[in-house]
Amino acid sequence: MNEVYVFTSESVSEGHPDKIADQISDAILDAILAQDPKARVACEVLVKTGMVLVGGEITTKAWVDVEEITRHVIKDIGYNSSQMGFDWESCAVLSAIGKQSPDIAQGVDNQQTKILGAGDQGLMFGYASRETDVFMPAPIAYAHRLMEKLAKARKSGQLPWLRPDAKCQLTLKYEQGMPVEVDTVVFSTQHSPDIEHKDLVEAIREEIIKSVLPAEWLNDKTRYFINPTGRFVIGGPLGDCGLTGRKIIVDTYGGMARHGGGCFSGKDPSKVDRSAAYAARHVAKNIVAAGLADKCELQISYAIGVAEPTSIFVDTFGTGRLKNSEIIDLIHTHFDLTPQGIIDQHDLLRPIYRQTATYGHYGRESFPWERLDKVAELSKAL
């Protein structure tokens, strides 16, 4: 690809209302899996001024204190004062949790064959490319790093006027399919009322943006829009309602790859919306790392109650060193994409999900689906 183009992705902070909901959902999931790895969990959360509503379907032998977990997450994020419009100590926590439908359960847990079927029908995508060291698209990878840096500056006291809610949007210029320049940075962060706008703009540009983005990508043409409305004091759940699963593009590839539509947070690994999307990322990343292609997008689909995928599709965008059909044959040979196979290979019945709920589910080496454990086998096909 020789054309010049720009591409934009966004990330949001851990204090963004939708991300508060995601973190509570996954914290509850982790607490349950720690006691009962075979639990069935679909936990949804709504947050608004002074209130958290936890709902969903949960079938488990475990007992967890939903209210305590919820308050701990809110405290950890940093909503610790009613002056922010949300306070971990005083907010109401309401619960509306039921059990998994027996009609769904009988399809997922086949008692005759002992085979774990997919928890629902659906289609999932995985993607990888060579444009960053973590095989992720650069716009979303660096947008996440900006949000992580902001959180560290807030929690360490480096920038004491910061508050938890924030988001950024990064537009990169591409040449020959690789990022070469930052075109635009949009950065909005909640703040205390006593910081002057010009001081905030300078601090964010110098101490956050320029400390994260490669210096060679920044120049006098780079555009910065930092708190462009001039004031962002009212934020978090006071400013906007938050819901689990509303940041699925932030959670994945920033729009660079397609998305099957299912969210991740609050779902146990029997839900292929989550586990098969992780598996698809694992497959795509190993294909690219093995040199079979410079870019790879993989689609998998499932039928409820059926273990084997109903389809596998691969697109290497003209960068493949093998035919797409040959890569699909390698996937069938080297990867078990049944729900049980995915769970076993990545050891997913563990309390590992709270950490995925912020700064993306991909691109961090601590996650088991990021392992490059199939590269040696796949590279033999070249």
Curated annotation (Swiss-Prot):
UniProt-listed Enzyme Commission number(s): 2.5.1.6
Signal sequence residues: none
Residues reported in the UniProt entry to bind K(+): E44
SUPFAM superfamilies linked: S-adenosylmethionine synthetase
Required co-factors: Mg(2+); K(+)
Residue ranges of the region described as Flexible loop: 100-110
HAMAP family the record matches: S_AdoMet_synth1 (MF_00086)
Annotated PANTHER family: S-ADENOSYLMETHIONINE SYNTHETASE (PTHR11964)
Function according to Swiss-Prot or TrEMBL: Catalyzes the formation of S-adenosylmethionine (AdoMet) from methionine and ATP. The overall synthetic reaction is composed of two sequential steps, AdoMet formation and the subsequent tripolyphosphate hydrolysis which occurs prior to release of AdoMet from the enzyme.
Name used for this protein in its record: S-adenosylmethionine synthase
